[in-house]
Amino acid sequence: MGSACEAGTDEPSRDDVKGTGNGILENGHSHKSEEEEWRNGMGEDLPNGHSTPPEPQQTDEQKEHQVRIVRWERFLPVKTLRVLLVENDDSTRQVVSALLRKCCYEVIPAENGLHAWQCLEDLQNHIDLVLTEVVMPRLSGIGLLSKITSHKICKDIPVIMMSSNDSMGTVFKCLSKGAVDFLVKPIRKNELKNLWQHVWRRCHSSSGSGSESGIRTQKCTKPKVDDEYENNSGSNNDNEDDDDNDEDDDDLSVGHNARDGSDNGSGTQSSWTKRAVEIDSPQQMSPDQPSDLPDSTCAQVIHPTSEICSNRWLPTANKRSGKKHKENNDDSMGKYLEIGAPRNSSMEYQSSPREMSVNPTEKQHETLMPQSKTTRETDSRNTQNEPTTQTVDLISSIARSTDDKQVVRINNAPDCSSKVPDGNDKNRDSLIDMTSEELGLKRLKTTGSATEIHDERNILKRSDLSAFTRYHTTVASNQGGAGFGGSCSPQDNSSEALKTDSNCKVKSNSDAAEIKQGSNGSSNNNDMGSSTKNAITKPSSNRGKVISPSAVKATQHTSAFHPVQRQTSPANVVGKDKVDEGIANGVNVGHPVDVQNSFMQHHHHVHYYVHVMTQQQQQPSIERGSSDAQCGSSNVFDPPIEGHAANYSVNGSFSGGHNGNNGQRGPSTAPNVGRPNMETVNGIVDENGAGGGNGSGSGSGNDLYQNGVCYREAALNKFRQKRKVRNFGKKVRYQSRKRLAEQRPRIRGQFVRQSGQEDQAGQDEDR
């Protein structure tokens, strides 16, 4: 169906075709005068664009053939396609030209890209298709493709690339530049037969709904396409700066779309060009869709600046101010992302999404039109840089409501006096924690001193949370100000332990996240940003309160706290009284906790067997005093833990090795109060680097470790002895076979015995 000579049985015979007078002569060519007249658009008065001589009579069979031929020419009016073949190799060019002529194409050969471009510039050639090689001297195929796509007239000509290099990079580059297809050499005849489909798609798409003359419709509609392209590019350029580079880019993208946007059947070019135009073109947004300002760079990439969406509703005189406002928004966005606080516009909380316009800056543009340029800039900076009072009131009300629920929730806890600094610290804690809980990890820029803001930034960057903390036990006691959460419950009773084992009444607003998560029975994945703020900024407050030694003694039995790496603080001094005072100071930095009650409750939950075993085996070491306070509980109260230094795996695995090491280390643990304590999750690292946590709670961890080492060494020695014996036997056997091979002759690869005496002598030697 590609040409007249390939019509097959669907076409009438040559005599019938000649009789119908459609201008189709033998050999599939038409009169030159008729073809030129048809290309110049002179035959528009005729139905097919051809000269039809009148016939006096026509039979019904001839009318059917005529209708069939008219329908065929409606879709492909060109009788023979002219193909510009660009190939630098002479033999390849001749072979491909012969194949194209066999497929009834007219071939115009070109040796290189420059010659091909000269042929394209000559409009008398009427080239319908370009088949070019990728790699050529002077002007390559990709360079020729770029020239064709950028030309106003030649951009409608389909370009097919061919090359022996079929790498993905080459194909991707050619298709992205505007090629409609890519053929891999050697080229087959069947591939060349189907080249007409690209021209048919182009003519059919440009002619609208399948008009009778596709090329004439294309010539008529090309100025319309250019006008639409200019309008679209003009509207797009209003959104951007008036730079020549931007206009050129828009020209290329829209030009590709005007030429190849309708190649729905090929699936090659339209997929590349449509995306660029869809991204650049403004799309009207519905008023119901909320258009909040993006708070992340990912959102900025996915959603283009909302200014583009509002240009259809804004006057043209106001678009320049929109650009300035966009730059100010970008500056403020970078500034607030740097310090960890979001930029909040005045419209973000005041109006609902249905009441908001399509663009948050639209109302500001409408109200600020009469004002001067500097006034608009200063107003936009003020609205973007400072949180409004309505926002602060909203967050404060949320914090107060959550705090009331928290107080009602823990009203059964023992009455412990909690002295929390009031004023700006409390407001800052409530604002930051509630924004992190309700508004999704957003930090507000509050009015505080420079040192407090600096500490907050450090906290944000220094979170010790990991992906596995949510699977451990929930923090039962207070976590807000003390910098630790003593885990007083096993893993299976997280929500129950929160109700029964919480022993302090927290007055800080920073415990809202803990109460909310604890009530759901979830883990202690809380906001680490504000939980240790008081412990960091004021580490030496409330130093006078001391916990009784019985509480410290309980810590030795239960090991309820997770050991952490210790940092030196003024409260930690070597000695019995100083250690107790340091523990008390660590607890009283934030909120005092009744440690003895919580430890004893937890003792009955989990570590009863550990308590019994340690009473029998480790009673002398427990009564030694403060030297045993180093068993992992005194280190918990350091402020830089950031609120999750509790023992998250209180299932007995840590406590057994813990108490086992205390008996061996003895007084040597007291000097470790003032230096970093190297403790692991499962036990204490001894001086020789061996961890002693065995989890059984019976006996010393180091004893079992030494027994295991001895057992392994014995097994290794036994294995080595066996290997020596086995290798010795192999060595002897190999030497005897070598000697036998030298003594015995071979026939066809087999040993042949010479005499029985030699065999007997060889056997004696082997023995």
From Swiss-Prot:
Localisation: Nucleus
CCT domain boundaries: 712-754
Acidic residues: compositionally biased ranges: 238-252
Residue ranges with Basic residues bias: 727-738
GO BP annotations listed: cytokinin-activated signaling pathway; phosphorelay signal transduction system; rhythmic process
Keyword Nucleus (UniProt): yes
Inducing factors: Expressed with a circadian rhythm showing a broad peak in the middle day.
Pfam families with a match to the protein in the record: CCT, Response_reg
Keyword presence, Nucleus: yes
Classification via InterPro entries: ARR-like (IPR045279), CCT_domain (IPR010402), CheY-like_superfamily (IPR011006), Sig_transdc_resp-reg_receiver (IPR001789)
Chain residue ranges for the region called Disordered: 1-64, 205-272, 312-388, 476-546, 646-701, 727-767
UniProt keywords, alphabetically: Biological rhythms, Nucleus, Transcription, Transcription regulation, Two-component regulatory system
Biased composition (Polar residues): 263-272, 343-361, 488-497, 532-543
Summary of the function given for this chain in its UniProt record: Controls photoperiodic flowering response. Seems to be one of the component of the circadian clock. Expression of several members of the ARR-like family is controlled by circadian rhythm. The particular coordinated sequential expression of PRR73, PRR37, PRR95, PRR59 and PPR1 result to circadian waves that may be at the basis of the endogenous circadian clock.
Family classification: Belongs to the ARR-like family.
Protein name: Two-component response regulator-like PRR73
Species of the source: Oryza sativa subsp. indica
